[in-house]
């Protein structure tokens, strides 16, 4: 049974559980505040219904927690692992559409002398610099050795891509500073 194109969350959950072996719903939710959260967001209210659906569909199996009988852990079934592998092998058909408020606001400013433009650009520069510092810190913390890079190479590449994007955005912002009057 496949997932509709728009439902990506089940694959994200499968990947997270595959990476850790088995996790509780709480642990899965926490993953969205760290590594996965750098490029994919999901809330508790989305995750738990999806876990129930995936268990019903037999993509996940419930594993009792020996330390806490009220806490449920999930692990991939053979079918869940096959579905994840099939999804990973399927080429993307389109680039994602970005919901970028900065771009949207800039789009609607017509006059290059509009004072709002300089404010938007400066604010965006500060946000991008903060993001870049955060990403560089994560890279330093997570990938300080060649072995760490080898063990999570895909994660390393995604982090490198994010750093590259932020560096390119800073370069672009430096080049579009509105001309000063005078």
Regions found by a protein language model. Give the residues of each.
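Mobile beta-alpha loop/short-helix "lid" or hinge segments that flank ligand
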Residues: 96-104, 135-144
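Heptad-repeat amphipathic alpha-helical coiled-coil interaction surface used
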Residues: 118, 125, 132, 139, ...
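Acidic interhelical loop/turn segments
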Residues: 137-157
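Long amphipathic alpha-helical coiled-coil segments
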Residues: 179-182
């Amino acid at each position: 049974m496949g997932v509709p194109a728009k439902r990506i969350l089940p694959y994200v959950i499968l990947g997270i559980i595959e990476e850790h072996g088995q996790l509780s719903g709480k642990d899965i939710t926490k993953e969205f505040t760290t590594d996965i959260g750098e490029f994919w967001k999901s809330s508790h209210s989305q995750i738990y219904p999806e876990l129930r659906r995936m268990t019903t569909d037999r993509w996940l199996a419930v594993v009792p927690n020996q330390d806490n009988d009220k806490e449920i852990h999930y692990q991939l079934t053979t079918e869940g692992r096959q579905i994840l592998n099939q999804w990973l092998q399927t080429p993307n058909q389109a680039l994602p559409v970005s919901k970028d408020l900065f771009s949207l606001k800039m789009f609607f400013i017509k006059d290059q002398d509009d004072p709002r433009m300089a404010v938007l650009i400066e604010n965006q520069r500060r946000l991008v610099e903060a993001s870049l510092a955060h990403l560089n810190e994560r890279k330093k913390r997570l990938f300080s050795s060649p072995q760490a890079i080898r063990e999570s190479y895909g994660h390393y590449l995604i982090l490198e891509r994010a750093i590259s994007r932020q560096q390119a955005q800073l370069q672009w912002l430096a080049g579009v500073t509105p001309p000063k009057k005078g």
